[in-house]
């Protein structure tokens, strides 16, 4: 079983990318569980056809300790298994603690047991690794492979660089490695070349360039992944390609985060000022 966490700047398209990739893997016959690690609980919505799923924390609040595995997971597109950690009420408590509670409960209930015959577990993690709770999947070795969703925008690259610093911090203790960058295009000038150069500097690869296409939004409005909504569309093939590349990937590295000055220089060389 491969344990993969998807990180990236808030709003970069992590949840959309994760769900479409999971749809691609599930379509290939892989058994995949997705664990949403975001208080918004929107990491599985497209796989579930828009159904709002009761989160682990909400279930614990209402059911107490008397919780069974099927209370906190639902079956989505192509038999994918969907779990949402959830979070505290806004302004109260720590969302990072919610992730820790949720993953520990899943372990106790046997969600990762060999009898479940999982090929993949994906953690869709909120934002940056500034908070210990959100770093939990890599800190505790729950995830062994990290993919960072990035674009050619400056703040997305800053966030990716910071996430790499977090990976380095936990790499030796937790055994976590970076599998690559996924460029979720924003149609920035020289974007593909810039992210390829950024990946080289980090000592990793741009595993896939996902072009920007309105079909993604169209599918989301219809509460589906692109692969389910329009399986013959070229954008569906992009996500299938990403799924296959992750399946075949054997490049797992401890990244070499860039100094801020060097990152800004790369942006100037390849970016809008080029």
UniProtKB/Swiss-Prot annotation:
Catalytic activity: N2 + 8 reduced [2Fe-2S]-[ferredoxin] + 16 ATP + 16 H2O = H2 + 8 oxidized [2Fe-2S]-[ferredoxin] + 2 NH4(+) + 16 ADP + 16 phosphate + 6 H(+)
Keywords, sorted A to Z: 4Fe-4S, ADP-ribosylation, ATP-binding, Iron, Iron-sulfur, Metal-binding, Nitrogen fixation, Nucleotide-binding, Oxidoreductase
Positions with a binding annotation for ATP: 8-15
Cofactor binding, per record: Binds 1 [4Fe-4S] cluster per dimer.
Cited SUPFAM superfamilies: P-loop containing nucleoside triphosphate hydrolases
GO biological process: nitrogen fixation
UniProt xrefs under InterPro entries: NifH/chlL_CS, NifH/frxC, Nitrogenase_Fe_NifH, P-loop_NTPase
PTM sites of type ADP-ribosylarginine: 97
Enzyme Commission number(s) of this protein: 1.18.6.1
UniProt keyword 4Fe-4S present: yes
Top EC category: oxidoreductase
Record's keyword annotation contains Iron: yes
Example GO molecular function: metal ion binding
Cofactor: [4Fe-4S] cluster
Binding of [4Fe-4S] cluster, residues: 94, 131
PTM text: The reversible ADP-ribosylation of Arg-97 inactivates the nitrogenase reductase and regulates nitrogenase activity.
Function: The key enzymatic reactions in nitrogen fixation are catalyzed by the nitrogenase complex, which has 2 components: the iron protein and the molybdenum-iron protein.
HAMAP family listed in its UniProt record: NifH
Assembly mode: Homodimer.
Family affiliation: Belongs to the NifH/BchL/ChlL family.
Protein name: Nitrogenase iron protein
Species the sequence originates in: Syntrophobacter fumaroxidans (strain DSM 10017 / MPOB)
